[in-house]
Each structure stands twice: as structure tokens, then as C-alpha cells.
């Protein structure tokens, strides 16, 4: 029996200001579906003991047989903010991680207000990690970094607490380096466009006379990076 009755979800649907669409993005096998199961368990839809085993949102038979997500699927969840008791309806979208189903990831990102970006702490930034981060960037979806499978650092690599801390710091820096690349690419494209426009305006008023010096405006990029201090 779900903790949140359907009538409560129906009531929340009438308050569109408190509805959020959130997609789960990651490289294949980094734990998207297990996380989705765990979030479903908070609403009593499945038992917490079955999280990661039942793969609830992998509703297709071939998904269950192959053990991978092939199609984006969603479900509505109830969330109550502890600070002010505000109630939200979260439309959670679990998306594929395999490169063959990247169109499903794009569709999920376009529908979303935010994204949970999962990274396996041992495997780190993989090909599809970069791809899903870029998809979130292109769609202007606000991402939250989720470092997953932390137990592997202790069980498999036998890390000490200080080693695990350093490893996670380095992993966050790797992800931020990817975001820095996106920022730089967009910045160069914007600067090139602005320079072309400035040259055109100069020709209109000065003809073929040499153009005076033109300076680029500095922009702060600190807001794009993941940082535990910022809560993202």
C-alpha cells in the first residue's frame, strides 16, 4: 500500500507552481534505476529491500531480461520539504544510459526542470557521463551531481576515509572540467559572434578604416560548477 494515496497526488497536480520534472542521467550501469527504485520506496510504492532488484521503471519485458534501461519512463512522487513543509509533486524520469538510446535521454532532458547526474565513484567520468552532461547543458537543465556506489571505495579499493575524501574531491574536479569545456565552447562562439557584429557596425560607420581595439567582457563562470558548499 503506497504511503501517499493517489488522491494526494491528484490534489498536488492542481498546484502547478509546486510541480517539478526531474530526470535521472548517467553512464550505463552507474546506478540510475537503483536510485529510482530507492526514491519509489520513499513513497511506499515498493519495499526498500527490493530497490535495485525489481527495476520498477524498466517496464518492458526486454528491459527486464537484458537488465538495462532502453526507454525513458516516469512516475509521480510526493516530496515534502523539511524546512518549510512545502509539498511538491516530483515527476521522476528514469532515462537510458547506453549510447544506443541517446534520443531517449534527449527527450527526458527536454521535459525536465532539473537532473540528477549520477557518477560511479570508481568508474568516474565515462563517455556517456560527458554526453548526458552536455545534453543537460544544451537544454539548460539544472543538474545536481550524485556520487554513487560509495561503498565500492571501501569494499573493493580498501580506501581510508581520507583517501576516499581526496578521491571524491578529484572526481568532482573531473566533472567540473567537463562543464568548463562546455562553458569555454559557448563563450568562444559568443565572442566570435560579438566580434563579427562589432566589425559590421565599424564598417557601417568607418568604412575600410582599421578597426580600433576591441575588448571582450569578462564573465563569471563560478555558478556552473558542482560544489558541496553550494549544495549541488
Predicted feature locations:
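Conserved C-terminal guanine-recognition region of P-loop GTPase G domains, centered on the G4
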Residues: 109, 114-220
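Glycine-rich, histidine-containing beta strand-loop boundary motifs that form or position
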Residues: 26, 37, 119, 145-149, ...
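Long, low-complexity, serine/threonine- and charged-residue-rich intrinsically disordered N-terminal tails
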Residues: 215-217, 222, 226-232
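Conserved nucleotide-binding/hydrolysis micro-motifs of P-loop NTPases
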Residues: 30, 42-45, 98-99, 122-125, ...
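P-loop NTPase switch module centered on the Walker A-proximal segment
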Residues: 1-119, 157, 166, 173-177
Amino acid at each position: 500500500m503506497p504511503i501517499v494515496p493517489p488522491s494526494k497526488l491528484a490534489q498536488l497536480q492542481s498546484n502547478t507552481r509546486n510541480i517539478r520534472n526531474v530526470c535521472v542521467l548517467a553512464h550505463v550501469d552507474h546506478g540510475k534505476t537503483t536510485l529510482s527504485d530507492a526514491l519509489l520506496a520513499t513513497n511506499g510504492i515498493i519495499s526498500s529491500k527490493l530497490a535495485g532488484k525489481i527495476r520498477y521503471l524498466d517496464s518492458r519485458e526486454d528491459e527486464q531480461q537484458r537488465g538495462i534501461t532502453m526507454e525513458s519512463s516516469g512516475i509521480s512522487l510526493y516530496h515534502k520539504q523539511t524546512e518549510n513543509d512545502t509539498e511538491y509533486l516530483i515527476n521522476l524520469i528514469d532515462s537510458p544510459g547506453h549510447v544506443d538510446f541517446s534520443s531517449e535521454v534527449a527527450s527526458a532532458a527536454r521535459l525536465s526542470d532539473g537532473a540528477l547526474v549520477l557518477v560511479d565513484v570508481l568508474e568516474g567520468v565515462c563517455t556517456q557521463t560527458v554526453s548526458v552532461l552536455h545534453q543537460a547543458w544544451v537544454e539548460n537543465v539544472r543538474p545536481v551531481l550524485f556520487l554513487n556506489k560509495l561503498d565500492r571505495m571501501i569494499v573493493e579499493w580498501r580506501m581510508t576515509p581520507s583517501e576516499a575524501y581526496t578521491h571524491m574531491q578529484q572526481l568532482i574536479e573531473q566533472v567540473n572540467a567537463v562543464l568548463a569545456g562546455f562553458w569555454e565552447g559557448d563563450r568562444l562562439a559568443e565572442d566570435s559572434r560579438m566580434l563579427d557584429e562589432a566589425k559590421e557596425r565599424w564598417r557601417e560607420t568607418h568604412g575600410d578604416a582599421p578597426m580600433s581595439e576591441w575588448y571582450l567582457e569578462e564573465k563569471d563562470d563560478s555558478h556552473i560548477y558542482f560544489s558541496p558548499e553550494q549544495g549541488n
